[in-house]
Regions:
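Non-catalytic C-terminal interaction segments of nucleic acid-processing enzymes
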Residues: 147-229
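Active-site metal-binding core of divalent-cation-utilizing nuclease and nuclease-like domains
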Residues: 53-87
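Conserved catalytic cores of phosphodiester-cleaving nucleases, focusing on short active-site segments
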Residues: 82-84, 90-98, 149
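Catalytic cores of nucleic-acid endonucleases
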Residues: 98-175
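Short acidic/His/Gly/Ser-rich catalytic and metal-binding motifs that mark active-site loops
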Residues: 55-61, 102-106, 181-183
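Aromatic-acidic/polar surface patches that form glycan- and anion
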Residues: 18-22, 72-75, 138-146
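A structured, charge-rich N-terminal accessory region that forms the first stable segment of a protein
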Residues: 1-62
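Extracellular structured ligand-interaction cores
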Residues: 77-81, 89-93, 141-143, 168
Length: 229
């Protein structure tokens, strides 16, 4: 999501994420994920702040040593829409969307270090080789946000071996249905099927499929905001 400021949101996926993580609604994702989540962010007590995983406080909470990300990624990392730890020692990372165009990323030039990390994961998950510039560019640019979230999920899973807090990582792309907060009603996604078809097309272009992602604990979930209180 593009709006990364702190504070209570009044529209879009940022607002819906704040609503679904509110105490009165926390049972919803617990039921969807069959787990009990303890939210690190966004929470009202912390002014709904969103965090990068290299934040010193987050690193400490996750039981990881300082400097663990040195040389892995530039200091400006992805900022997560939601971070939670569960009673089962699972680290949950959330990327939230409430309209289709939020998935598309800019085509800005990426640093060599970023491209290298994406290449590693794209090769491992999708079998994309260095010479396949067409598919690689989709990971670098068009679907960069999806790509970098997958990269960090894999990184955090590797770090689970040394964490004292979590042993497994789950990445959730959480997509909201019937978000009427958008002034442009054309942006509103009216069914989970619409989201499903959109993701299936994207995954096909990226050279991955839903089943292979789920085998790596990467899930696409949908929720109708009309069911929030």
């Amino acid at each position: 999501m593009s709006n990364t400021s702190n504070g209570k949101a009044n529209k879009g996926s940022k607002m819906q994420m704040q609503r679904i993580t509110a105490k009165k609604n926390q049972h919803i994702l617990n039921e969807i994920l069959s787990d009990k989540l303890i939210w690190l962010a966004p929470i009202e007590e912390d002014n709904y702040r969103e965090y990068q995983l290299n934040n010193a406080e987050i690193i400490k909470i996750l039981g990881l040593p300082k400097g663990i990300f040195k040389g892995f990624w530039p200091s400006r990392q992805p900022q997560w829409d939601g971070i939670a730890i569960s009673e089962k020692k699972v680290l949950y990372l959330f990327e939230a969307k409430s309209h289709l165009s939020e998935i598309q990323s800019s085509k800005s030039k990426k640093q060599e270090l970023i491209r290298m990390r994406i290449d590693e994961v794209a090769n491992e998950i999708a079998g994309i080789k260095p010479g396949d510039d067409c598919k690689r560019n989709l990971w670098y640019h068009n679907y960069y946000q999806i790509a970098n979230r997958i990269v960090f999920k894999e990184k955090m899973q590797g770090l689970a071996e040394i964490s004292t807090v979590y042993k497994k990582v789950v990445l959730v792309f959480l997509n909201f249905v019937n978000d009427t907060s958008w002034k442009d009603s054309k942006k509103m996604v009216k069914s989970s099927t619409e989201w499903e078809e959109h993701y299936l097309r994207i995954f096909k272009e990226m050279g991955v499929d839903k089943d292979s992602l789920q085998s790596r604990n990467i899930y696409i979930k949908y929720f109708d905001v009309e069911n929030l209180v």
